[in-house]
């Protein structure tokens, strides 16, 4: 939840809608996705048939890979994962990863291989040691890498971002290689594939990129590589285009739901960002089986946006407290507690949750109960933040994050995603673990909160608001806003290390659980790096076009 404004006393009658004080720009997409027309059934069937043939051709290549050809095997797995194809070969990849981890008989003097092996294993949950990079340290403190060996330099840079606290060799690798890559970039042809890879890595290290966006951007780069596998390339293009069809149908459904929600509730003051919210959630759950997760996530994010804007900008304290009381009842009879302008929204919200139960069916509808609990907790915390606001209370950073790391919606998002997954490894125990707000999810929540605050605080100077984490740090440590923002950026960087350490220590949970949290972190980083792209969504327009509007030429 963004920082709320100072308290305004309520003198309006229940029937009056609070006046909008925001200047949110209108949707950039209007009814664009509502008019989407899918290809004919025969066209789609033909695409799926071709994709299945190609998947089996690639599977044969993967099954023929061994650790005896370690560089080729590691590179193939990395390529498949970057192209968004890893999902189809999870069993084969898991088997190869175990062999790669168990086999220590490889050339430890090959910096590119060492870096790619380290990256691949840590990314996939293996806690391999970083001291293997000590072999490449020079007396001057740099890393031994021939000037012409640019690929190894880039691999080392990307591998080093899978670092934990105290791994000085990886901290030094980032500092050293970044300078060399920046210098190298100035000497490369700007349109060359390798220049694009270097530029992308300097902006966003490979581990932190949104998977579906990386696939879309990497396909044309891979197409120009001399060592490309034609079957892999053709499959990557076809697979992306098939996914895009699914995404557009889901966007059409979510857009129709949103338009009905706003039209019937008459809450026209809220941010109209359903396309951007789908884009955001898609980045966390892009694999083919997770269609229902994407839909539930998008609708939950839309509901949170409405509630956030009511609490944040438009609702009086009295009205918001009435809403909080009614919220936990989950019953139409509670509308008598609400001011008139909230009643239709409340009913529509109940209908939305009922639709989740219907979609999940009798065996999995229990999951919605956990999702409701997560939302109840969210609204409870919004109410606490309003009380802080009204008291002009400035918490310490630690106290603020105890509340705001949770009120940012981390539990609601993770439970929404788990709820829609067909994977039967997601059990009641998974939800109970998530709702206990364990340290791993708390760290993720802190990451989202800090990422949001560091880009929104200056914008919120234009209106009354309660303190963000930036203001809390400024008061607690007596610093300027710029200094506080720099410190919070350091804390954000530390959060990546914390999440990696905590994920490697998780036991007894489905593999998708930590993967999902990292995917949420990646897509959140994309939303909040340098700007609040949800509120000012022009920054996302090109990315949305790439994912949902422009198919890849085959």
Swiss-Prot record:
GO terms for biological process: defense response; diterpenoid biosynthetic process. Mg(2+) 3 binds at residues 452, 456, 460. Binds 3 Mg(2+) or Mn(2+) ions per subunit. Pathway: Secondary metabolite biosynthesis; terpenoid biosynthesis. The keyword Metal-binding applies. Substrate binds at residues 308, 312, 449, 452. The keyword Aminoacyl-tRNA synthetase does not apply. Keywords: Cytoplasm, Lyase, Magnesium, Manganese, Metal-binding, Plant defense. Mg(2+) 1 binds at residues 308, 312. One of its GO terms (molecular function) is magnesium ion binding. It is an enzyme of class 4 (lyase). Sesquiterpene synthase involved in the production after herbivore attack of a blend of volatiles that attracts natural enemies of herbivores. Converts farnesyl diphosphate to sesquithujene, (S)-beta-bisabolene, (Z)-alpha-bergamotene, sesquisabinene B and several minor products. Can also act in vitro as a monoterpene synthase, converting geranyl diphosphate to (S)-(-)-limonene, beta-myrcene and 11 other monoterpenes. This is Sesquithujene synthase A. It comes from Zea mays (Maize).
């Amino acid at each position: 939840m963004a920082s709320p404004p100072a308290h305004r006393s309520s003198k309006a009658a229940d029937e009056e809608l609070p006046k909008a004080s925001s200047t949110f720009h209108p949707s950039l997409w209007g009814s664009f996705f509502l008019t989407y027309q899918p290809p004919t059934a025969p066209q789609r069937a033909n695409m799926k048939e071709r994709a299945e043939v190609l998947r089996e051709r690639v599977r044969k290549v993967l099954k023929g890979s061994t650790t005896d050809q370690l560089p080729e095997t590691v590179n193939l797995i990395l390529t498949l994962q970057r192209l968004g194809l890893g999902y189809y070969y999870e069993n084969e990849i898991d088997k190869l990863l175990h062999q790669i981890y168990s086999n220590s008989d490889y050339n430890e003097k090959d910096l590119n291989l060492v870096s790619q092996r380290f990256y691949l294993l840590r990314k996939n949950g293996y806690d391999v040691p970083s001291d293997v990079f000590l072999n490449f340290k020079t007396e001057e403190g740099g890393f031994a890498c021939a000037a012409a060996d640019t690929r190894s330099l880039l691999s080392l840079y990307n591998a080093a971002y899978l670092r934990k606290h105290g791994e000085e060799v990886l901290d030094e690798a980032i500092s050293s290689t970044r300078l060399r890559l920046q210098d190298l970039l100035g000497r490369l042809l700007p349109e060359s594939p390798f220049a694009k890879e270097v530029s992308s890595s300097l902006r966003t290290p490979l581990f932190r990129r949104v998977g579906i966006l990386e696939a879309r951007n990497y396909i044309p780069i891979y197409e120009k590589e001399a060592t490309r596998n034609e079957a892999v390339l053709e499959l990557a293009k076809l697979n992306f285009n098939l996914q895009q069809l699914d995404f557009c149908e889901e966007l059409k459904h979510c857009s129709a739901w949103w338009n009905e929600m706003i039209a019937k509730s008459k809450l026209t003051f809220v941010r109209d960002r359903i396309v951007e919210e789908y884009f955001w959630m898609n980045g966390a759950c892009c694999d083919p089986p997770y269609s229902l997760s994407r839909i539930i996530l998008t609708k939950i994010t839309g509901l949170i946006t409405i509630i956030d804007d009511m609490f944040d900008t438009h609702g009086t304290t009295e009205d918001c407290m009435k809403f909080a009381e009614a919220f936990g009842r989950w019953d139409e009879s509670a509308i008598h507690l609400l001011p008139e302008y909230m009643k239709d929204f409340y009913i529509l919200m109940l209908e939305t949750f009922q639709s989740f139960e219907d979609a999940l069916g009798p065996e999995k509808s229990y999951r919605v109960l956990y999702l409701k609990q997560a939302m109840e907790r969210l609204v409870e915390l919004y109410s606490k933040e309003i009380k802080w606001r009204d008291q002009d209370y400035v918490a310490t950073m630690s106290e603020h994050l105890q509340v705001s790391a949770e009120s940012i919606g981390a539990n609601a998002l993770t439970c929404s995603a788990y709820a829609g997954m067909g994977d039967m490894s997601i059990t009641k125990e998974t939800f109970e673990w998530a709702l206990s707000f364990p340290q791993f999810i708390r760290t993720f929540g802190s990451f989202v909160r800090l990422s949001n605050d560091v880009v929104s605080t200056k914008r919120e100077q234009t209106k009354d608001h309660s303190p963000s984490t930036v203001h809390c740090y400024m008061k607690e440590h007596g610093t300027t806003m710029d200094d506080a923002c720099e410190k919070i950026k350091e804390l954000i960087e530390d959060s990546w290390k914390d999440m990696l350490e905590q994920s490697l220590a998780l036991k007894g949970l489905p593999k998708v659980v930590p993967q999902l949290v990292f995917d949420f972190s990646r897509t959140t980083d994309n939303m909040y790096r340098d700007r609040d792209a949800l509120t000012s969504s022009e920054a996302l327009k090109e990315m949305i076009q790439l994912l949902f509007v422009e198919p890849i030429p085959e």
